[in-house]
């Protein structure tokens, strides 16, 4: 488990692509030096910094990070409703860094863990496979490969799921 800072400078948000694609949903502040900064709306950039902080070998993979810290989102009124539209929340979040050939096995492991936890509480998971959006980062072939791996893992654990076309991130 890790804890990352609640505010990052503009440069990190630009590097991650969030400044261009998500800035309107972020709370923005200026440092005492006038430098633009963003209050953390997601954990991804901080986890990337942790991963790249030292030289790693493929033998170090999978490399797993988990965090439960407050996130803040400045979402427009009416976008979401009820408890799904809040300005501050704690997200139980994880990032797994893997090689391409570890994707399926790692996702399958996580799905089995999710199923065990849900079963322990007599809950039924609702699973959705969100596919490549119209505007996406990366290569189309990478998305196709990742989507195929995700679908294969869902089927391997006999999960009931729906496909959300174009809703991936």
Q: Which residues does each PLM region occupy?
A:
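TRNA-recognition modules of translation machinery and tRNA-sensing kinases, especially anticodon-binding
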Residues: 1-169
